[in-house]
């Protein structure tokens, strides 16, 4: 294999999945990919399963920590930077690419100290703490949404790397003569407010207008959610997980979900209209900013959790289900926002920096 590239990403799938897509692209171009993570994040399952070598450093966040932890923070940071620098000196990568998570801060600083160019990719419309702090040290900044880094002269709007199979080419069958299909996504852990809200809302939609329902309720939430639908008199298929998202998106005409960065990018890739209920406690309210990206272009409805009740959601569902042409217009708007070249664009940017 060729020269080494070091990817830094950890903690959640929102950071790790785009990084994995880029890792595959680097490999396709002949590079050897190494990964810098932490001992506890989701990367410990996903990265080895992808056949990549995972190097770990001890890195933790600072938000919400007590005074003792904050006093220890400078020493912990020095330790994690030292660990990362030792790994970087051994691997001698041509570039280091940070996708977010606690590992990105010390890893990026170590790369800068070692003279290795750093590239940052931010998935959300509002930059995470680690990426925000790393930007001054970065040779190039890739943003998924326009104007995330308005003060950076080195930014490039690339979009979020999304699996190629989610870019659906086949047009959906017309709604004439059939029921609409509603996909509800609660995430792997489940979004309990959505699990409670949707059965109540759908019960208030006229039976002849009510869509077919597929509800992904999350681990340990499927049985109680299915019971809520039964109690509400609404037919629904409820599952804890969805293994094949391409199939699920291809089935759906409309999606109700949270507004994580990857979800937003996947909805655009699949050309799907949506009703977005951002997680109200997300750091810096970044999900609302993510959702606004689709909403202001007419591809989604932004429905804040604090002000959206069952009657509000039922009214909105009724409105769009009575206007199939509205759903099609929203689908076209979503498709216009898709970034099918995002993975290639991020990797191109990295290699321009590495070999420029």
From Swiss-Prot:
It is found in: Cell inner membrane. The keyword Metal-binding does not apply. One of its GO terms (molecular function) is undecaprenyldiphospho-muramoylpentapeptide beta-N-acetylglucosaminyltransferase activity. GO terms for biological process: carbohydrate metabolic process; cell division; cell wall organization; lipid glycosylation; peptidoglycan biosynthetic process; regulation of cell shape. It catalyses: di-trans,octa-cis-undecaprenyl diphospho-N-acetyl-alpha-D-muramoyl-L-alanyl-D-glutamyl-meso-2,6-diaminopimeloyl-D-alanyl-D-alanine + UDP-N-acetyl-alpha-D-glucosamine = di-trans,octa-cis-undecaprenyl diphospho-[N-acetyl-alpha-D-glucosaminyl-(1->4)]-N-acetyl-alpha-D-muramoyl-L-alanyl-D-glutamyl-meso-2,6-diaminopimeloyl-D-alanyl-D-alanine + UDP + H(+). Coiled coil: none annotated. Keywords: Cell cycle, Cell division, Cell inner membrane, Cell membrane, Cell shape, Cell wall biogenesis/degradation, Glycosyltransferase, Membrane, Peptidoglycan synthesis, Transferase. It is a peripheral membrane protein. Belongs to the glycosyltransferase 28 family. MurG subfamily. This is UDP-N-acetylglucosamine--N-acetylmuramyl-(pentapeptide) pyrophosphoryl-undecaprenol N-acetylglucosamine transferase. It comes from Pseudomonas fluorescens (strain Pf0-1).
């Amino acid at each position: 294999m060729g020269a080494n590239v070091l990817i830094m990403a950890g903690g959640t799938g929102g950071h790790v999945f785009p990084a994995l897509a880029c890792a595959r692209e680097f490999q396709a171009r002949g590079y050897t990919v190494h990964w810098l993570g932490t001992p506890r994040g989701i990367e410990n399952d996903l990265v080895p399963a992808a056949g990549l070598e995972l190097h770990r450093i001890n890195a933790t966040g600072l938000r919400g920590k007590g005074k003792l932890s904050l006093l220890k923070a400078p020493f912990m940071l020095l330790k994690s930077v030292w660990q990362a620098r030792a790994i970087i000196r051994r691997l001698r990568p041509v570039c280091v690419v940070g996708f977010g998570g606690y590992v990105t801060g010390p890893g990026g600083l170590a790369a800068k100290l070692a003279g290795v160019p750093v590239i940052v990719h931010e998935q959300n419309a509002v930059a995470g703490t680690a990426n925000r702090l790393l930007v001054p040290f970065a040779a190039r900044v890739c943003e998924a949404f326009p104007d995330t880094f308005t003060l950076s002269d080195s930014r490039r709007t690339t979009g979020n790397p999304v699996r190629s199979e989610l870019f659906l080419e086949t047009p959906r069958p017309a709604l004439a003569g059939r029921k609409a299909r509603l996909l509800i996504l609660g995430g792997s852990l489940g979004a309990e407010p959505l699990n409670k809200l949707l059965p109540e809302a759908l019960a208030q939609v006229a039976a002849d207008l009510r869509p077919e329902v597929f509800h992904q309720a999350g681990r340990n939430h499927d049985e109680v959610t299915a019971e809520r639908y039964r109690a509400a008199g609404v037919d629904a298929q409820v599952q804890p997980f969805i293994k094949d998202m391409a199939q699920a998106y291809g089935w759906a005409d409309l999606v109700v979900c949270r507004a994580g960065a990857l979800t937003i990018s996947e909805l655009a890739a699949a050309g799907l209209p949506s009703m977005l209920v951002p997680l109200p406690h997300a750091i810096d309210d970044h999900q609302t900013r993510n959702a606004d990206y689709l909403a202001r272009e007419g591809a989604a409805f932004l429905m804040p959790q604090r002000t959206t009740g069952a009657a509000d959601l039922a009214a909105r569902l009724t409105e769009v289900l009575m206007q199939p042409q509205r759903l099609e217009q929203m689908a076209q708007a979503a498709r216009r926002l898709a970034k099918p070249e995002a993975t290639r664009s991020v990797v191109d940017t990295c290699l321009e920096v590495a070999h420029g």
